[in-house]
């Protein structure tokens, strides 16, 4: 278990007296906590690596007891690093990985199993069975007819709906079908279900609070973003009792206080938010048409669609960004896997020592000498949607060296960004206002500049790239009046660099055309 704590030089005695907010991000690979002052400066930080468990092929779990200890530890360490007292914390905001869930005993609080990660594939056969079923075909055809006559977006969404293993829905159905302890607890109405946010809230309040927020609920596959409630249709289809599911609250909301036995003082828990939505908020993408490009383990492209959920054919799905009082903000999101994963894989092959080296390695060449990389260790997502695609290098020659391989990997990330952006433009008919990037890979200026060139848009990179922490803290700060409104947050956000298009699309056209050929040859490689 690795950990780190840092404290910037700017911690000042006057700001210490003013109070602070905490932003915690529980990600798939790391759990981070930052302490923010009123100027939104990071005064202290702590991070630990989240360890995934692989009990069987395709199964991905997280030990809840270990995660809990890490959560408590990063808060204590970040407060210590900031040189402040816990009683100076005026609010806690929690951002979490999405669609990772657990069930537990309502009376004792004891969990029935480990967290089932959003990456877990145990429900693959259930997904195939449901998506290929006569019932799903009937639902799709009926909703297509209803959409034709009514033009209702809700019927369009239903006509395109398919289950995936990333949804909670069928992984939860698998648990209900296969774990007798859970079945018994459900029958006795003694079972609670929760994503990471709900479980942490339950633990922090010693069992007194049971809730989630709209952003987390909307990513489960069990929530109807049009009706803004748990879907009675989906839960009924899968025999999931509504009584299992937590009440859905505003994103910036008083969820209760941390039991004072944990940190010595009762810290207010005033924001629960899903990680991509938190990053969107942290980037101050508050207006319709604002776009966020997160490049981390995978790439997520989100556009603010106002208060209207937007469904597309090519792979953009509707989510609730956040709900604060009467304000409901919807997003359309799509993703590409294996962004940071590809870079980490190359590092494991000793193509470089530090990921920071890759920028100069790529820039030292005119081109990749006809070498192309397909980043599909976990298949290809939108707009190609092929889970059977394989990762590959193509165009290798005796003269190919590690510099060509690294450049090809970085180019593939930019090419996938271009594909996602084009799909968004074709299917989400909302003019783009601005684009902001975050995530670890956005530190790579080669990828950033090439993406800017390919999409012919200006892209803003912030000073601090941990936008999920920032968004959680911002939502918490608004809830307690630490910051007055979103206009104040906009003024506090700091831009590190703005990338403007330097090359025309024509200069990339042949290269991207060849890369697309490589992608097509990698598709349908695996049988299942």
Curated annotation (Swiss-Prot):
The keyword Kinase applies. ATP binds at residues 28-29, 297, 340, 440. Signal peptide: none annotated. GO terms for molecular function: ATP binding; glycerol kinase activity. Its EC number is 2.7.1.30. Belongs to the FGGY kinase family. This is Glycerol kinase 5. It comes from Bos taurus.
């Amino acid at each position: 278990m690795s950990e780190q704590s840092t404290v910037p030089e700017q911690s000042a005695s006057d700001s210490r007296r003013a109070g602070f907010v905490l932003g915690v991000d529980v990600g798939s690979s790391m759990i981070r906590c930052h302490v923010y002052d009123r100027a939104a400066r990071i005064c202290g930080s702590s991070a630990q690596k989240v360890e995934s468990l692989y009990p069987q092929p395709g199964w991905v779990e997280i030990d809840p007891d270990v995660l809990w200890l890490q959560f408590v530890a990063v808060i204590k360490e970040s407060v210590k690093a900031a040189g402040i007292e816990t009683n100076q914390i005026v609010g806690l905001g929690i951002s979490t990985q999405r669609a990772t869930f657990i069930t537990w005993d309502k009376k004792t609080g004891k969990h029935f199993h480990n967290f089932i990660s959003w990456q877990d594939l145990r429900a693959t056969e259930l997904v195939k069975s449901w998506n290929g079923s006569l019932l799903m075909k009937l639902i799709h055809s009926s909703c297509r007819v209803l959409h034709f006559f009514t033009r209702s977006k809700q019927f369009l969404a239903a006509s395109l709906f398919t289950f995936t293993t990333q949804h909670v829905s069928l992984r939860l159905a698998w648990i209900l079908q296969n774990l007798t302890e859970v079945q018994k607890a459900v029958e006795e109405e003694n079972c609670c279900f929760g994503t990471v946010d709900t479980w942490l809230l339950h633990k922090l309040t010693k069992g007194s609070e049971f809730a989630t927020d709209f952003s987390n609920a909307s990513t489960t596959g069990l929530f109807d973003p049009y009706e803004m409630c748990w879907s009675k249709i989906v839960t009924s289809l899968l025999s999931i009792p509504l009584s299992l599911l937590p009440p859905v609250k505003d994103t910036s909301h008083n969820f209760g206080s941390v039991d004072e036995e944990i940190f010595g003082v009762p810290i207010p828990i005033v924001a629960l938010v899903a990680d991509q939505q938190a990053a969107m908020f942290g980037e101050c993408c508050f207006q319709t048409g604002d776009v966020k490009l997160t490049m981390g383990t995978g790439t997520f492209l989100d556009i603010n669609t106002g208060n209207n959920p937007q469904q597309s054919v090519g792979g953009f799905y509707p989510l609730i960004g956040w709900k604060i009082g009467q304000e409901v903000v919807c997003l359309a999101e799509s993703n590409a896997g294996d962004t940071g994963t590809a870079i980490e894989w190359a590092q494991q092959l000793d193509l470089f020592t530090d990921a920071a080296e890759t920028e100069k390695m790529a820039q030292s060449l005119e081109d990749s000498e006809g070498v192309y990389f397909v980043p599909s260790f976990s298949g290809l997502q939108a707009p190609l949607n092929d889970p059977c695609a394989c990762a590959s290098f193509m165009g290798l020659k005796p003269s190919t060296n590690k510099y060509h391989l690294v450049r090809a990997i970085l180019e593939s990330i930019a090419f996938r960004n271009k594909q996602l952006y084009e799909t968004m433009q074709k299917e989400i008919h909302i003019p783009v206002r601005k684009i902001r990037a975050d995530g670890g890979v956005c530190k790579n200026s080669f990828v950033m500049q090439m993406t800017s060139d390919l999409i012919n848009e200006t892209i803003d990179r912030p000073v601090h790239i941990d936008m999920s922490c920032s968004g959680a803290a911002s939502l918490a700060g608004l809830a307690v009046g630490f910051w007055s409104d979103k206009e104040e947050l906009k003024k506090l956000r700091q831009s590190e660099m703005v990338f403007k298009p330097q090359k025309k699309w024509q200069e990339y056209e042949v290269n991207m055309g060849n890369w697309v050929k490589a992608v097509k040859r990698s598709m349908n490689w695996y049988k299942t």
